[in-house]
């Protein structure tokens, strides 16, 4: 009750502040960014430069005949808000002047087209037609780019996933992360981004990524995308729930004519080069097919659009069926009894020894080639209905199905059992938008969306239940991945309700609104339920797991070393043997983790089960003020709150109950909800030339990221009461916290009886009592200059400073900084804290040419430096600090730091009906900590071998027949020069990797894609 009262009081304060701002700004209120629509504004003057008030302006969409009227004010200005993207004809009329017609004025999502118009006196009826729009936008203050229909349609994309177009825009990079590719804006974490589809939230609130994430080959059919806007920095107060970038995706609509398409794209092994290490893509083929159709339900009133796309793909990897390294093993069946030294020195002998051992002892074949089949299809339907002159309704439905077997891991040294089945995942999204014109100066947009994502994940069939990692280089893996043991059932659904109101008065455009997102996640996460073993070497594993008759010391063994690091012998733990005096255990089992053991306490959910909800609230008010004909000011305030779930059981019943009164214990057992997220945003655009050819833009704002639910769940379930875990490690002298026993017999689990209550040494997870959501302070300055008609250059500088970044710190670790645990009665204590920081500086130089004279292009170069003390996106299982009590030692260049980046894109009509599109992408390597191990000063002090360069291109020739039909064959080539483009997302030793999705090795080789498309 008290919590609800506090939330109500906070909301009341925000409403009062918003109302106060409203009163201040109602010298009532030039055009602002629209999430799903665009704006056309302009100034009408006569031949002498005098303003022409009361001039009538009619705007008509060429494809649907949707129309809007406006009239100029005393200063000759007009604004038409909330225009659906498309091409418009403007007709400007005034008594005594020749009618002025502007053709092909293109409105894109989020754009504000500013037209300087001049009318000439005429005593007779006369029409003057022009066909030109400004090259430089002199009213926008943010650093944003709109990828129009031509860019979406013509750019060669290897997988036809719309997210791969984002790197065409400056300030956006794709970096290799532990859960797949991450989209980073101005150096920020990928989980900070906000993706919207047709105005509705298109994010998975649990994983902190777009729906479908990296698992789905596609989540929206590219054929349905009309255009999208990318706001890298400087977003206005209307945009929330982001400390990174904003991506607005707008889908196509039907028109007065019936139009459609059918297409088929094909890649295959015969048209693919060997990878840079000389290996073919075995049995590779990819078929991508689909089509669209759209047209009128009723002319000028209602329209329909449908799109479908399917994918069928397979790829066979050799994995452990092929030799490892350059030297084959000289012994066909190496064993530790006869060949221990040979196994230690030869990676291929390790492969044979391990796979033969597992086949013999577990009847599990680990050395077969691995198929990676993909089955994916996406469908979108949309209806647009002009209800009357004042109301326009748009409803869209997006569905995606994805099932990808053996797509969890793509690592050459992983066995057949170390993989998972991603799916079948199903995404359902419904978006409803109602656009209402109350008067020529007042418009409203009401929105509701519902999304539901079912994302099951399971292991492949295996007789090895435990996730088993063996060795450092090479690093092998067998058994159920720890996060899929044996499966994860995850269902997320959310609703998004918002309303925005815009009001034009004089030289102000005032806008305010609010939104509410309700998210519910229902899952059973069986992480570490069947255990995870990490062994230092192949022979160490074989010694540990083999009985003495086979040359081992099993069922569990100690590897002893003296103080100088010299090996002193093996000891069998099952016999109660310990290391000799002066020696200590150093292996072979470096770490064992187990979770999901029930305490038997009544009134708590079963292990792994969690139903959690989040509520996100937002209010904003903003004004765009045309202070002078050459200066536009944008300013606003946004407030947000994220209401986190309450504890499953009272904190006084948890394993850490006795510590709640201890001032050194970092948590009170609850998740504190951030409710005071006030975010001022300001910006200006200054037309320096006073001719619309040179503009200086600048913006500053505070932006809050939201906390994904994956980071929340552990603190709800891992409380020692619902479930507890055990940890066995070298630092515990190979006893196990959470159980009074020695490490288990591989591949079994620690035999702890459920129902025994909370044990001594149970591991827990908590939220810090002073937790706050990540906060980013961003400043951007940009200069853009028109060199010639349709041709501009631009220079951009961005500075972003991050505070309160999420870090996962295990405060009960021991090491050189602590000889004994801080709280000896507990095992690991992972704290979700807000102590991280970051700093990004980036400079961009670019050129841009709009389509004219049969070609367009854009190129940009980015020089940047990105620093932080923890680049962890959402991995709650890993403490990446060197010393949890001195986090300043971790501050260095970020995992995402790409010092140099270059992008170029062009579309050219080559002649004879042939069209060409060319794309170049290049970036330098990401940093990594030396393989020798982390020290106090060497975090990310070296560079990986994952620098990237790719030259992609497409040639196509439409063959037209009839009035509106065309058949277009296409020839595409990707990675033309067959660059290695190595994939290395690891941030440390592969043995200790806890990624939920991992691909390593060489990148995609040169590939040819053949396609044909029929349009009508």
Q: What kind of feature is each model-predicted range?
A:
Residues 209-210, 223-230, 237-246, 252-343, ...:
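Outer-membrane beta-barrel translocator/receptor signature
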Residues 97-120, 124-253, 268-274, 286, ...:
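Periplasmic N-terminal accessory/gating domains of Gram-negative outer-membrane beta-barrel systems
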Residues 3, 9, 13-148, 223:
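Periplasm-facing N-terminal accessory domains of Gram-negative outer-membrane beta-barrel systems
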Residues 175, 459, 600-601, 647-679, ...:
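Solvent-exposed loop/turn elements at secondary-structure boundaries
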Residues 790, 912-934, 945-950, 956-1016:
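C-terminal beta-signal and adjacent terminal beta-strands/loops
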Residues 794-927:
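Gram-negative outer-membrane beta-barrel transporters
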Residues 190, 252-254, 298-300, 388-390, ...:
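Outer-membrane beta-barrel channels and translocator barrels
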